């Protein structure tokens, strides 16, 4: 007998993250942001570096988390990804103390270039030739 695939709890890949995935991702984002703000890491590459956690996406089984990170005012986040990968076990341990889940997710860091792109677009919009076109009255 075939089971009903439309029942709640069974999700296809095209529907997007579940409410549980979103809730766990947001909780994880808050915990990571707090750790990055309050912890001095032993890794010399991360000494004095301020990391911003922009977004966290959870896998459907909640065992993997993709963490999108950036640095405010800097575009060199790619060079810190290996150091973030090295401290991932420490971060998992710290997160595990307060996370009420069966498994603490594996952390996979990715650069978040959205802020860099927004800054670039803002600079383009404030160029003199663009400002001239924006301030020119309509001639129809």
From Swiss-Prot:
Renumbered residue ranges of the record's region Disordered: 1-23
- A GO-annotated cellular component: cytosol
Which Pfam family name is an example for this entry?
RBFA
What cystine pairs are annotated? none
Q: Does the keyword Cytoplasm apply?
A: yes
Q: What is its main location?
A: cytoplasm
* Highest taxon in the source lineage: Bacteria
**Keyword entries, A-Z:** Cytoplasm, Ribosome biogenesis
Q: Name one GO molecular function term.
A: ribosomal small subunit binding
Q: Which InterPro entries match?
A: KH_dom-like_a/b (IPR015946), RbfA (IPR000238), RbfA_dom_sf (IPR023799), Ribosome-bd_factorA_CS (IPR020053)
PROSITE patterns for the chain = RBFA
User: Can you supply a Gene Ontology BP term from the record?
Assistant: maturation of SSU-rRNA
> Where, subcellularly, is it found?
Cytoplasm
Record's subunit section: Monomer. Binds 30S ribosomal subunits, but not 50S ribosomal subunits or 70S ribosomes.
Name the family the entry cites.
Belongs to the RbfA family.
Known role? One of several proteins that assist in the late maturation steps of the functional core of the 30S ribosomal subunit. Associates with free 30S ribosomal subunits (but not with 30S subunits that are part of 70S ribosomes or polysomes). Required for efficient processing of 16S rRNA. May interact with the 5'-terminal helix region of 16S rRNA.
Name the record gives this protein: Ribosome-binding factor A
The species this protein belongs to is Acidiphilium cryptum (strain JF-5)
Q: Point out the gene that encodes the protein.
A: rbfA
């Amino acid at each position: 007998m075939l089971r009903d695939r439309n029942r709640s709890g069974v999700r296809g890949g095209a529907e997007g993250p579940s409410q549980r995935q979103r809730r766990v991702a947001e909780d994880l984002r808050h915990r990571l942001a707090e750790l990055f703000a309050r912890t001095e890491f032993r890794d010399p590459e991360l000494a004095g570096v301020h990391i911003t956690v922009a977004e966290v996406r959870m896998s459907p089984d909640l065992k993997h988390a993709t963490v999108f990170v950036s640095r405010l005012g800097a575009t060199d986040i790619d060079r810190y990804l290996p150091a973030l990968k090295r401290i991932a076990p420490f971060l998992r341990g710290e997160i595990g103390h307060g996370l009420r889940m069966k498994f603490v997710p594996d952390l996979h860091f990715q650069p978040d270039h959205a802020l860099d792109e927004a800054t670039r677009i803002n600079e383009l919009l404030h160029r003199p030739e663009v400002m001239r076109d924006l301030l020119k009255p309509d001639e129809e």
